[in-house]
């Protein structure tokens, strides 16, 4: 008797935003005290961002991940002990080690002894993590995965640099992927090019108790924009080809919520109407690895994304990294 093909499919989604919502005007007022000029109009015109959320000083990335994970577990209606794989995509972990995934496993009280580890691909992190979880499930090594994107980017922002500090926010999003005989994740594509590592980075490290280099985020905005609009369309088309789907068969596009201009450019190149693109960057800002799962959860909970629909996610981030996945929800 032939063995049935295993797939991974999304059982549930969850997200969490810290309660401190900071509007552009509030941020501009804060920066003005440091002699830094910006405005709501300036930020909106260049990014599409109106507000973002910042975590309180005593709140960690694993705290945000825990809240999102609980909601995803509840939505999936599963026993947390059935989770045998946890992957957390983050560039702002609680510690150098142990991993945020191990800390999250403990906070959730999961005693299954399954694998738990972090993925660091910055804003592409969730696309990387989801593709990895899908591969583990298809290969039979694991059956139920908790995949999380969580960030506290406010901790690495230089609030004297108005070109970066207005862009980012904190938050977490999560999905439960489970083994299924019904197709879920249909195709993924991941890429990186380390020769562009200097255009988006936090070039610091800990050496003998001292931070060497810079602990703040650095970005060459123009270089990132040019590279992003070039690679995102290509990786989306590649993932679609692996899924044997044409762009017009996609019901929803969920791009990394970096900048509305990058997002609309990719949507247009794929020939998709803007109405099929999920947008949360206006209220969340750029939450790096958390942005895609947070946007997914928003669109699932407000009823836009329905079971059986095809969803394309794509992201690009520091490294330079980029990736995409297509799944049937």
From Swiss-Prot:
Gene Ontology molecular-function annotations: 3-oxoacyl-[acyl-carrier-protein] synthase activity; beta-ketoacyl-acyl-carrier-protein synthase III activity
| Coiled-coil region list | none
Name the keywords, alphabetized: Acyltransferase, Cytoplasm, Fatty acid biosynthesis, Fatty acid metabolism, Lipid biosynthesis, Lipid metabolism, Multifunctional enzyme, Transferase
Give the domain of life.
Bacteria
Q: Does the keyword Ribonucleoprotein apply?
A: no
Q: Which GO terms describe its biological process?
A: fatty acid biosynthetic process; secondary metabolite biosynthetic process
Say which enzyme class the record assigns: transferase
Record carries keyword Lipid biosynthesis? yes
Q: In which pathway does it act?
A: Lipid metabolism; fatty acid biosynthesis
State the disulfide connectivity: none
SUPFAM superfamilies the UniProt entry points to: Thiolase-like
Example of a GO cellular component annotation carried by this entry: cytoplasm
One matching Pfam family is ACP_syn_III_C
Instruction: Report residue spans for region: ACP-binding.
Output: 257-261
For this protein, the record's CDD domains field holds: KAS_III (cd00830)
Entry EC no(s): 2.3.1.180
Describe the reaction catalysed, as an equation.
Answer: malonyl-[ACP] + acetyl-CoA + H(+) = 3-oxobutanoyl-[ACP] + CO2 + CoA
User: What does the UniProt entry say about where the protein is found?
Assistant: Cytoplasm
Q: Which family does it belong to?
A: Belongs to the thiolase-like superfamily. FabH family.
Q: Read off the domain note.
A: The last Arg residue of the ACP-binding site is essential for the weak association between ACP/AcpP and FabH.
Q: What does the subunit comment say?
A: Homodimer.
What does the protein in this record do? Answer: Catalyzes the condensation reaction of fatty acid synthesis by the addition to an acyl acceptor of two carbons from malonyl-ACP. Catalyzes the first condensation reaction which initiates fatty acid synthesis and may therefore play a role in governing the total rate of fatty acid production. Possesses both acetoacetyl-ACP synthase and acetyl transacylase activities. Its substrate specificity determines the biosynthesis of branched-chain and/or straight-chain of fatty acids.
> What is the name attached to this protein's record?
Beta-ketoacyl-[acyl-carrier-protein] synthase III
Instruction: Give the species this sequence originates from.
Output: Burkholderia vietnamiensis (strain G4 / LMG 22486)
The protein's gene is named fabH
